[in-house]
Each structure stands twice: as C-alpha cells, then as structure tokens.
Amino acid sequence: MSERKQAPETPWYLRPFGPLVSLALLCVVWGVYGKARLSGRRTRAQRAWQVVSQGCVYDLGRDLTRHNCFRYCNRGSLSSAYFAQATAALSDGYIYLALTHSNSPAGEVIGLFTGRAYNHISLAFDRALKTLVSYNGGEGGEAPGLNPETLKGLAERKGASVRVYRLVATRHQKQIMLKRLRKINQEGSAYNLLGLLFPMSCQPNIMFCSQFVYAMLRLAGLHYFRKNPLQVRPTDFVEWDRRGRLAFVAEFTFDGVCLHCQDSIPQMRPTAG
C-alpha cells in the first residue's frame, strides 16, 4: 500500500503567501462586485456580495496555510486498493466525469469567477464511482493535491448536486490514464491555488481539478475540444461538447439527510463558439 504523507510545514519564506492570496482574492471579489454594480448586472453583484458577507473568502484564506503552490505536498494519496479497483474496471468501455455543485466556500469563490454553479470536476474508471479521483484542497487531514473522492463526500453539503457523464474509452486509453495516475501518486502533487488567479503552474503535477481532468483526457487522446489546460473550467467539458461525445448517466443530490439519484434531467447545452 502506498505511504500517505501529510502536508509538510510551510517554509517560513512562503508563510506570507497565504494572507497575500487571501487579500488578493478579497480585492478581486470586491472588484467584481463594483464592476457588476456599475454595469447594472444585479445578479452578479448580489452573488459577489454574498461571497463576501458569508465569509467565503475568509474561510478560504484561513485554509491557505495548508497549500503549497511551489512544491509537492501530497504523495501516496492513492492506495493499492484504489489501483486494484481501477484496474478491474479497465474493460468497462467508458471513463466517467462527475461535475459537482458543492456549495463550499472555495466553490462559491470559484463560481463567482467562472459564472457557473458547477465548480468541480472529477473522473472515475468505473460506473459505481468507486474510483473517483481529482485534484482538491484535501479533506479529513489529506494534503491538497491529487486525492481519491467519494460521491457522498462530493454531495455532503445541503443543496449540493453531482452530475455524472460517461465518455467512450478503450482499455488502452484507460491504461494510459491509470499509468499517469501512478506516476503522479509516486512523484507527488499539490493543488494549483495560484492557477485560479493567474494562468500558471509552477510544476507539472501542480494542478486544479479541471486542469487535471483535461490533461488526463488529452494524454489518452480522449479530449474533444482544444483549450489551454490552465483556462479550462469544469463546465467546459459539457458546454464544449459540440458533437455529443458525453452521455448523461445520473444526477445525485443531497437534501441534508439522504442522497438522491435521478437518471433523467435536461442536459446543459453547448455554448462555446
């Protein structure tokens, strides 16, 4: 089983980075609010005010000390059991994408920038979603970076929802992606928090969720639109699907008590020009 390592203590010379990014985020959000007010975009202004008033930026800023945008802080997060499950699903015929509306502080801030409600994306090798994986901020002591995920974990907040899609993939294509996952798991990773503000990544394995999913699909020759990975938004995988490559599987919602599944909903329409 892979050895799981927690995030190392942030070096002294990087410690001011967290508060600075938090301040930058707050300034950007206030800028969005002011611009929306001046341009008469009432809905966007209300959303920016909500992000500030609910303390989303503060909550996100408080969590910044766990992140490291310059070196890998996550290694061995995927266990041998995970890789065994993924290997068993290689002949499934599909790769699965899970698009999440999370209602988390990070999700609210990201949603303000992207203008989309769905703000996180993951991939899985099996229909049961036992092999969900993505880049995230880490939960339950996990270091930010490449981490396994669960459907329940994605939809744990009241009002959250997860839309699942499938994309045809051969065994060989899934093997390519799985091999890459093993390499990242061994080399290490970190969440590209800086990339949410600026189109940059300091090291190859420092990514955010949509950057990671797009890179994996492109590596296996499964990407169906062309875009700079650093500019890919989670909803682009649906909105840029001009040829109908994705097939909707189900939507999962959480009402605060139970997880509900619905297998028929109106699909998002492609909007990319």
Please provide the spans of the model-predicted regions.
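Cysteine-nucleophile amide-bond enzymes
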Residues: 1-273
